[in-house]
Amino acid sequence: MLLDETRVNSSTLVKVTIAIPTYNRREKLRRLLNSIRASTFRNYEVVVVDDASSDGTREMIMEEFQDVVYIRHESPTLVAKSRNDAIEASRGDYIFFVDDDNVVEPTTVARLVDFMEKNEDVGTAAPVTCWYSNPRKVMYAGAVFSPFMRRTVFLYAGTDCRELEGKVIEVDTFANSYMFRREAVERAGPIPWRRVPWNGEDGYLQYKIKRLGYRNVTLGSARVYHDADPEEGARRYNDMRLYYALRAKIFFHQDLDPPLRRTGFYISLPVYTAYYMWVARRGGRGVAPVLRGLLDGIMGREGLQYV
């Protein structure tokens, strides 16, 4: 791992660390970093953790964004390790994670910080994620788990983003972008990255924070725009995603749910397995990664099976 030590060891006070895990998305990362430069909030540092990109990401950072703290993995370890490394390198009172395929609205960081400063019981706050290709439509505004099956229910999908202005939405977890309170992260500890290396690793830490007694909320007045294909559907599930989707969910609820909720999840596990097998077939793939993820989850096998 390569790290610019001089930036990390600086004694300059920083309110927010903006943390960006990345892998082979040089142009999207450049666009995100430029959107951050336009932020109305100025007391921040940026930490980019590169999971061994081969597309010139490092050269782009060194040439165009010399103020960024750049950490590079020599070989891929997946995103949970990248998030842990960003937290370890961070200096801010708040840590704002944003995935590399986003654009951040200029007022988003300021609004999240202001809200968290005024609400000390909030451990994690997130902006609304809107579609980059359709900026007025909500992609998701956080998620909650259903009481029995523990199904992840994304909130407000398809709603006009402007309708959420002024709302504070209580949630269980988020994807894509969110701001942690440092105190909450330190109490929760790092993501067990060999156990949940990808697909739900951020939710694992967020829900652990909620279990400590903090609130997790989505702030309707803050927005990011996620550059994802709304028509991709089952095609986004390659073998790696199929495997970790099921294994990580098993570990998540096994580790973090109280006994009654965990029992409901276990009873529902055949439904999840059947669903991911259907997704695999619909995407033109075999079901072997799904079955392997199921077996490894049940047997408690950790580690990086796909990278």
PLM region spans:
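Conserved donor NDP-sugar-binding/catalytic core segment of glycosyltransferases
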Residues: 107-147
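A conserved acidic beta->alpha catalytic loop
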Residues: 35, 50-59, 75
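A short, conserved alpha-helix in the catalytic core of glycosyltransferases
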Residues: 172-180, 184-189, 194-222
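Short, flexible, basic/aromatic active-site loop/helix in glycosyltransferases
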Residues: 145-171
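Short, acidic, metal-binding catalytic loop of nucleotide-sugar glycosyltransferases
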Residues: 34-43
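Non-catalytic, C-terminal membrane-associated alpha-helical segments of glycosyltransferases
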Residues: 240-245, 258-307
